[in-house]
Amino acid sequence: MTTAVILGLLALISYLLGSIPTGYLLAKALRGIDIREHGSGSTGATNVLRVVGKGPGLVTFLVDVGKGLGAILVARWVLGQAWSPVPAGWFEFVLLAIAFIAVLAHSKPIWLGWRGGKSVATGLGVLLALNAPTALATFGVFLVVLAVSRIVSLSSMTAAIALPFWFWFFTQSWPFVGFSVIAGAFVIWRHQSNIQRLLAGTEPRLGASQG
């Protein structure tokens, strides 16, 4: 296979994994509802937790993390094979491109008319595969802010802002830092409605029935 074919297949696999609508499928199976018509309208773990329950919310979170993790692990395995024609010098940039495709796919799944989640859990999975210390430190920021504020959206956006600093601290890699700026900005952009509610003082805290 040519380099273009390999890269195209990796991009397709990453998109297909990232776009699996975990929360939507669970809500349909367990409650017979379209999760996008309830709560915040997101298919992500937080909305599933509020609308469907803690168990489904946790399952959604874990599967969504696994989607991001799996996309990078598959790409890393393929790129590391002797039969792969992709130049070794492209390795880092290909992984970062695959990572962003997985993040994008979670938010923009073709199966649901491009309406998905906010890519936080899938982004965490991607980070775990790219650089585990960065992932854990960023998740730590999320947990600290969540413990203080009990607002998931604020915690997610704060973690996204902290991400480039952690990537630089652990990797000193400008491509990784650049990726984190773009991916973090995308996650924050996906939280536009949450930002409006935060400014209005109406964003629900963890445990509320709506969000």
Swiss-Prot record:
It is a multi-pass membrane protein. GO terms for biological process: phospholipid biosynthetic process. Keywords: Cell inner membrane, Cell membrane, Lipid biosynthesis, Lipid metabolism, Membrane, Phospholipid biosynthesis, Phospholipid metabolism, Transferase, Transmembrane, Transmembrane helix. Its EC number is 2.3.1.275. This is Glycerol-3-phosphate acyltransferase. The chain crosses the membrane at residues 5-25, 55-75, 85-105, 126-146, 168-188. NCBIfam families: glycerol-3-phosphate 1-O-acyltransferase PlsY. It is found in: Cell inner membrane. GO terms for molecular function: acyl-phosphate glycerol-3-phosphate acyltransferase activity. Its main location: membrane. Pathway: Lipid metabolism; phospholipid metabolism. It catalyses: an acyl phosphate + sn-glycerol 3-phosphate = a 1-acyl-sn-glycero-3-phosphate + phosphate. Belongs to the PlsY family. The gene is plsY. It comes from the Bacteria. InterPro entries: G3P_acylTferase_PlsY. Catalyzes the transfer of an acyl group from acyl-phosphate (acyl-PO(4)) to glycerol-3-phosphate (G3P) to form lysophosphatidic acid (LPA). This enzyme utilizes acyl-phosphate as fatty acyl donor, but not acyl-CoA or acyl-ACP. Probably interacts with PlsX. It comes from Thermosynechococcus vestitus (strain NIES-2133 / IAM M-273 / BP-1). Pfam families: G3P_acyltransf. One of its GO terms (cellular component) is plasma membrane.
